[in-house]
Amino acid sequence: MKRNILAVLGVSAALVLTASTISQDVQTKKTLNDGTVVINTTTIGSKIYGYRDVTPVEISLKGGKVVKVEALPNYETPDYFKLLKDGKLLESWNGLTAEKALEKEVDAVSGATYSSKGIIDNVREGLKFYLGKTDKK
């Protein structure tokens, strides 16, 4: 019994250390060799939830325009999250300047409203960060 408790405590400690290491390694902003700026909202959007949990994204911008929004790993229900991809929610900001993308009113995808809102809010936070309109780092 004592061994089982120690084993569980050891595994729990390892998981906590791994989780904290992962979150520390997240780079919020990086610039690729071709000049593309990639904003990762894992940290700045850590309190933005979809239906089940946080919904971080990476926003790629080149020349001040959104090139791509990509959903990062999350715990949203796969079938509902697929509705977002099929509904092209992630493409809603492509081709827009960061300023225009931030101003754009994007509708949630029917059937995946909470997940949509999480993505939309993460994109907004990421764009604010890119434009220097936030104190979060």
Can you say where each PLM-predicted feature lies in the sequence?
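Flexible, solvent-exposed loop/hinge segments and secondary-structure transition points
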Residues: 2-10, 17-137
